[in-house]
């Protein structure tokens, strides 16, 4: 097992191997414990690629919840789950944190199969409230007695699923606690009317900063708690006036706050009184993303998931690599300068999708809808109906949430919407919840959607140009990772649906596009009889070239960074069958099972789509493959 960098004196944390050990500490010891937890999290995250700022901001509420509740009997749910590092440490996984998100190590999110203390498996936003409601309903139906508490960020609360669940929670009236962790951030800055309402609540200053502020907050809460319990609706000590302007109250959910989310002793005091109230209650806490680490507090967007850094100084080496996200961002920003119809829509992924510069250069043609993928797609449909050329910039794993909108709102009317799909394929350390290995399959099933897989930044630009100048919905998918930068003004002319022969050889031909093409070229580089085709379009296929290679080669190998179920390989087999061509075909792709976290290269090897795996298949097909020493 790996060791954490640096050393630290953690006398309190050393005593804790589970929640029961935490309860043995006095309340007066809790602030010191939270400082030790923050130091531990900083050391864990200093290796890079982990969720630092959000985890630091949630330390106090996680500590308070475990101090008051009885996990795993009581169920504590975390929305998204990336902020739950303190939860993992306090529930007996401290010695596994050095290997978090590594192959064979623990997940970076909560995961039911990992620990009895992880109430849900999660990675996507806005799911916790519906899960919590289901648990509360099941508890009551089974005649059991335990608490259900869900921790959700203000960013996740912008998601329609969370708001819809909140509406049902208020209607059902079951006992449960919702902790609204308000740090004004998701990954990018939060947007939308709900975010503005949350800021309005903070402005009212129902808690004060400075010495003695916590006591004042507690005193302010006492009367409203009594009012809530007696259902007096017109108390002069209500937190808001009138109550009807508060959407939580309007939904039938008791609201308390906002309170200081970094005073662990006062959070304990509050939780002890709130968890036993009948009906649903929201505790609104205000936190600072990156709390306790000055450089993370100053730049929470970068420190959300930083590269490797020195925990003492915050110094890090900026990456000089050119990412696919940057390639897309530069291309669409440049293209929009020449076409006033181009309008970019994204669901809370400005930084991740490479759109910071676009949002600055074209602020009136940029829309961040928050964590609301369905809204992003249908808003783009509305734009297209009015003659715009919207581009939806979205991660593959999140496009899954808007399948119906792509089908119903875009494809049926063959609208001019371009989907630029980042993080397509295996993403690596974030694991099963974030791998983008289904988009080829579900988009293939929608009539009229054309799908491209660029091999590099130049092809991405060519596909974007084609999509923005031709009618109908287009999908351009590209992986997480890096590509070669191309000069501004590079706009190659591509014909959609036309493949490219990259290596001669007619005995066995490998068909691959995107990331998989790199593996195919490497596998075949020293094999003269093995051809390689850049199958950069999955829909439509290049039937002319497929007929040619399918008629000559004795075997074809399709390779894709997508599930084998309904993917590129299936499309090739369907086409060959319709042509009455029957060469041997081997379909390589992601197996029909969820892939756990590891590096993308490791998962590709495990799935059998990397260069050595392709060479093994070539040998099985009778190709003379030199033995590698």
Swiss-Prot record:
Transferase keyword on record: yes
Q: What class of enzyme is it?
A: transferase
Q: Where does thiamine diphosphate bind?
A: 82, 123-125, 155-156, 183, 373
Q: Where does Mg(2+) bind?
A: 154, 183
Q: Which SMART domains match?
A: Transket_pyr
The entry lists its GO molecular-function terms as: 1-deoxy-D-xylulose-5-phosphate synthase activity; magnesium ion binding; thiamine pyrophosphate binding
User: How many cofactor units bind, and how?
Assistant: Binds 1 Mg(2+) ion per subunit. Binds 1 thiamine pyrophosphate per subunit.
Q: Name one Pfam family in it.
A: Transketolase_C
Q: Name one GO cellular component term.
A: cytosol
Q: In which pathway does it act?
A: Metabolic intermediate biosynthesis; 1-deoxy-D-xylulose 5-phosphate biosynthesis; 1-deoxy-D-xylulose 5-phosphate from D-glyceraldehyde 3-phosphate and pyruvate: step 1/1
Give the E.C. number(s): 2.2.1.7
Family from the record = Belongs to the transketolase family. DXPS subfamily.
Q: What is this protein's function per UniProt? A: Catalyzes the acyloin condensation reaction between C atoms 2 and 3 of pyruvate and glyceraldehyde 3-phosphate to yield 1-deoxy-D-xylulose-5-phosphate (DXP).
Q: Which HAMAP family does the annotation name?
A: DXP_synth
Record protein name field: 1-deoxy-D-xylulose-5-phosphate synthase
Q: Which organism is it from?
A: Deinococcus radiodurans (strain ATCC 13939 / DSM 20539 / JCM 16871 / CCUG 27074 / LMG 4051 / NBRC 15346 / NCIMB 9279 / VKM B-1422 / R1)
């Amino acid at each position: 097992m790996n060791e954490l960098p640096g050393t630290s004196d953690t006398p309190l944390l050393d005593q804790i191997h589970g929640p029961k050990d935490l309860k043995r500490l006095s309340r007066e010891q809790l602030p010191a414990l939270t400082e030790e937890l923050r130091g531990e999290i900083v050391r864990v995250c200093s290796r890079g690629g982990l969720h630092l700022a959000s985890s630091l901001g949630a330390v106090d509420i996680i500590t308070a919840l475990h101090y008051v509740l009885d996990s795993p009997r009581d169920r504590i749910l975390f929305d998204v789950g990336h902020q739950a590092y303190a939860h993992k440490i306090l529930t007996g996984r401290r010695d596994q944190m050095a290997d978090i998100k590594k192959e064979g190590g623990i997940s970076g999110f909560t995961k039911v199969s990992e620990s009895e203390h992880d109430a849900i498996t999660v990675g996507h936003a806005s799911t916790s409230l519906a899960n919590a409601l289901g648990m509360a309903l099941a508890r009551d139906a089974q005649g059991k007695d335990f608490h259900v508490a869900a921790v959700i960020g203000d960013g996740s609360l912008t998601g329609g699923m969370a708001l819809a669940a909140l509406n049902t929670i208020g209607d059902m009236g079951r006992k449960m606690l919702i902790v609204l962790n308000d740090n004004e951030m998701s990954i990018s800055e939060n947007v939308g009317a709900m975010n503005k309402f949350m800021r309005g609540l903070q402005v009212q200053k129902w808690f004060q900063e400075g010495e003695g502020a916590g006591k004042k907050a507690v005193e302010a809460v006492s009367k409203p708690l009594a009012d809530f319990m007696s259902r007096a609706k017109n108390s002069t000590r209500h937190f808001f006036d009138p109550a009807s302007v508060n959407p939580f109250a309007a939904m039938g959910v008791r609201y308390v706050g906002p309170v200081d989310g970094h005073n662990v002793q006062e959070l304990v005091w509050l939780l002890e009184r709130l968890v036993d109230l009948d009906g649903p209650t929201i505790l609104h806490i205000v936190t600072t993303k990156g709390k306790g680490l000055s450089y993370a507090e100053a730049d929470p967007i970068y420190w959300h998931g930083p590269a490797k850094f020195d925990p003492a100084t915050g110094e890090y080496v900026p990456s000089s690599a050119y990412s696919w996200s940057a390639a897309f961002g530069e291309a669409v920003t440049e293209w929009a300068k020449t076409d006033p119809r181009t309008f970019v829509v994204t669901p809370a992924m400005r930084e991740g999708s490479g759109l910071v510069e676009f949002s600055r250069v074209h602020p009136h043609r940029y829309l961040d809808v928050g964590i609301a993928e369905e809204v992003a797609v249908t808003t783009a449909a509305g734009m297209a109906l009015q003659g715009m050329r919207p581009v939806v910039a979205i991660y593959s794993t999140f496009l899954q949430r808007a399948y119906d909108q792509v089908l119903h709102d875009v494809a049926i009317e063959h609208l001019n919407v371009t989907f630029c799909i980042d993080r397509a394929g295996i993403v690596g350390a974030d694991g099963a919840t974030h791998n983008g290995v289904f988009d080829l399959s579900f988009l293939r099933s929608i009539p009229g959607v054309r799908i491209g897989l660029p091999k590099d930044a130049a092809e991405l630009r060519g596909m974007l140009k084609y999509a923005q100048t031709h009618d109908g919905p287009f999908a351009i998918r590209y992986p997480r990772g890096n590509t070669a930068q191309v000069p501004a003004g590079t706009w190659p002319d591509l014909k959609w649906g036309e493949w490219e022969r990259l290596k001669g050889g007619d005995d066995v031909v490998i068909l691959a596009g995107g990331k998989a093409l790199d593996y195919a070229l490497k596998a075949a580089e020293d094999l003269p009889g093995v051809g390689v085709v850049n199958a950069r379009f999955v829909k439509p296929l290049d039937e002319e070239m497929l007929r040619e290679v399918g008629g000559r080669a004795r075997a074809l190998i399709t390779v894709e960074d997508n599930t084998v179920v309904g993917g590129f390989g299936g499309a090739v087999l369907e086409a060959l069958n319709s042509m009455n061509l029957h060469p041997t075909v081997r379909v390589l792709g992601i197996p029909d099972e969820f892939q756990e976290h590891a590096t993308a290269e490791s998962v590709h090897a495990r799935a059998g789509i990397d260069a050595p795996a392709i060479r093994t298949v070539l040998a099985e097909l009778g190709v003379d493959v030199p033995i590698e020493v």
